[in-house]
Structures are given as C-alpha cells and as structure tokens.
C-alpha cells in the first residue's frame, strides 16, 4: 500500500514532472491560497510517513526492492524540491502554509537521516538549510504551528546548522502548558480533537501518561 501511494509521486518528481502530471482537485471550500501549496503538502507528508520504512536496511525481498526504488526516487525528488531551476521547485517563499509542510520534510530527514539526508549532495543540503531558515519570516500563531516551527529548528540543530533554540523551547513549553490530560493536548488555548499528538509526541520513560 505504501508503495502504491508513493510511487506515482516520487517517480514523477524524481524527473521534475510532479507539477506537470499531478492532477489537483480544489474543494468547494478552498480558502483561496495558491494551489502550489499542494505539491509541498503532498511531498512532505508522504516522505514523513514513509521515512521510517525507507530507513530499513536493503534486502533481496520484494519489499526490499520496492524500498530501494522509492529511496532512489526520493533522493532525486529532494533535490528537485529546492532547485530554483527545477519545474518541481516547491513553494517555499510565499504563503504561510509552507511552514507546516516544510516541517514534514524536516521530519523525514530526522526519521531517516542516514538514508535520506546524508546521501544528498552538498549543494542540495545547503539549499534545504537556507530554505528552512528563511521560513523564520513566518510568525506562527500560538497553536500547534509552534510545533511545526520547532520541528524545523530541531532538524537544523541535528544537521549542525544555525538554529533557533528559543523556537524549540517555546513550542515544548507551550505544549506542556496545553496538556489537558489523558494523552490529549489542546490546539493552543482551544481544545480540539485532532491527530497532532500522534505526530509530535513519543513514549518517554519520564512521563508515560502524557505520551
């Protein structure tokens, strides 16, 4: 199933043809943002989801061959995503939504650093670092968006790049403040039933109840 979802995206993006071939349908309730946010949302969330799977070692099984193929496509796709001359250069510098979806890309690097970040060439790495740092232009509201900002800064720290520790600490402190019990966190001051806790929290030996 993961391969069936990922292959159409990565096979096209690896050739710089995702925007050309991806069919985008707009909801009747679309809020008017640029449709180009769709491509980063698609790529970022896909890669964050399959990164742990792609981090598994290669083997000669059918699944192993699929992972290897996806990983090869993914590395080429990552390069297109930050290459200003590529048709698949993503929407990094407009709108506010890129803060959210770039965090998923950063998450994919954190989840499979050796497989998805380290093999990238130095030019591509520096482009990612620059794009991530430029997202500081976005002042996140006091909601779960603080966590997206912190995810990006956490990756920059992991990559030995200049990072903003205040953004990380602020997100962690606000998340602790917004804990409402029984494993749930509010989305800012307003409680909401959503899945963010599954994305941003993990079991901790120090606090099993909140995890």
Where are these regions (language model features)?
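Conserved small/polar residues in nucleotide/adenosyl-binding loops
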Residues: 200-209
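Secondary-structure boundary/capping residues
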Residues: 184, 210-211
């Amino acid at each position: 199933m993961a391969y069936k979802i990922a292959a159409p995206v990565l096979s096209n993006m690896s050739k710089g043809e995702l925007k050309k071939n991806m069919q985008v349908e707009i909801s009747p309730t679309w809020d008017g943002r640029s449709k180009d946010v769709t491509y980063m949302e698609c790529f970022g969330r896909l890669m964050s989801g399959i990164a742990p799977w792609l981090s598994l070692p290669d083997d000669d099984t059918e699944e192993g061959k699929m992972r290897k193929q996806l990983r090869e496509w993914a590395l080429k796709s990552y390069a297109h995503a930050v290459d200003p001359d590529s048709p698949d250069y993503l929407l990094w510098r407009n709108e506010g939504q890129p803060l959210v979806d770039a965090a998923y890309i950063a998450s994919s690097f954190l989840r499979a650093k050796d497989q998805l970040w380290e093999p990238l060439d130095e030019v591509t790495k520096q482009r990612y670092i620059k794009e991530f740092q430029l997202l500081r232009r976005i002042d996140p509201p006091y909601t779960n968006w603080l966590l997206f900002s912190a995810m990006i800064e956490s990756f920059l720290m992991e990559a030995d790049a200049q990072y903003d520790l205040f953004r990380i600490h602020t997100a962690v402190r606000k998340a602790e403040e917004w804990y409402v019990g029984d494993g749930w966190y509010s989305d800012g001051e307003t409680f909401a039933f959503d899945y963010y806790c599954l994305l941003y929290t993990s079991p901790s030996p120090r606090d099993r109840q909140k995890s």
